[in-house]
Amino acid sequence: MTLAARPPFEEPLGRGRARLLPWATVMVGSLVTILPWSATLPLLPPAGLLILLSWRLLAPLSLRVWAPALLGLFDDLLSGQPLGSAMLLWTLAFFLVEAIDARSGVRDFKQSWAIAAIAIGFVLVGGRLVATPLDAHVDSVLLLQIVISVLLFPAAARLVAWIDLRRAL
């Protein structure tokens, strides 16, 4: 919907609500982990992380630099991971994306996807090191979860792009 196609009396999204929308979508993504899924292997991708990375890569100014710490705390409280693990890992991933973004300048979606793949792999491997003993044999399942998460990133990015378009109108 373009600005010309908007109905004449439709109110635009308020400034406070427009700033709250990225936070709310990441929190809703983190809420996916509490849904009753029937699975024998933990292959559910971290939807909150995917949406957080999508917001950072598609609309860099939508979230502040300190936002991953609070959103990671929310995710830790819901997912059952050790408290502070997502806070630390999401913040470090956000800084990693910031550093790569500062060095690369202009990028296309394939490069954003590669940056997200690096960040997703970093967070999931870091979460495995924090949450499970080193002698636990979960590496093949973790690799499969990383692959699924990286393959689902374009869907999360498309959702965030659609939400950001609606937020702008």
Predicted regions, residues:
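Terminal, non-globular segments
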Residues: 1-169
